[in-house]
Amino acid sequence: MSLNATEKAAIVAEYAQSEGDTGSPEVQVALLTTQINHLQGHFKAHIHDHHSRRGLLRMVAQRRKLLDYLKGKNVDRYGALIGKLGLRR
């Protein structure tokens, strides 16, 4: 349930800070959020898929770490990102 190249390129273009930016926390969090949202649909149909659930939990933890890093570095960018992605915090 990974993203195809066009979806990934669209997300990178939307959240990149500059041309060719693929490693900024905003881009990484946006990609992880999209993958997490795709997997939520998978788990509605496959409730007992515990192996994939472990991968989902790793993605959620990685996203949390990146958000904490961004919050420590620049609170304004953090607030803008969670508002744009519709995350709870």
From Swiss-Prot:
Molecular function terms, GO-annotated: rRNA binding; structural constituent of ribosome
Keyword Ribosomal protein among UniProt keywords: yes
Gene3D superfamilies: 6.10.250.3130, S15/NS1, RNA-binding
Pfam family, one: Ribosomal_S15
GO annotations of cellular component type: cytosolic small ribosomal subunit
Keywords: Ribonucleoprotein, Ribosomal protein, RNA-binding, rRNA-binding
Keyword Cell cycle (UniProt): no
Subunit structure, interactors included: Part of the 30S ribosomal subunit. Forms a bridge to the 50S subunit in the 70S ribosome, contacting the 23S rRNA.
Family membership noted in the UniProt record: Belongs to the universal ribosomal protein uS15 family.
Protein name: Small ribosomal subunit protein uS15
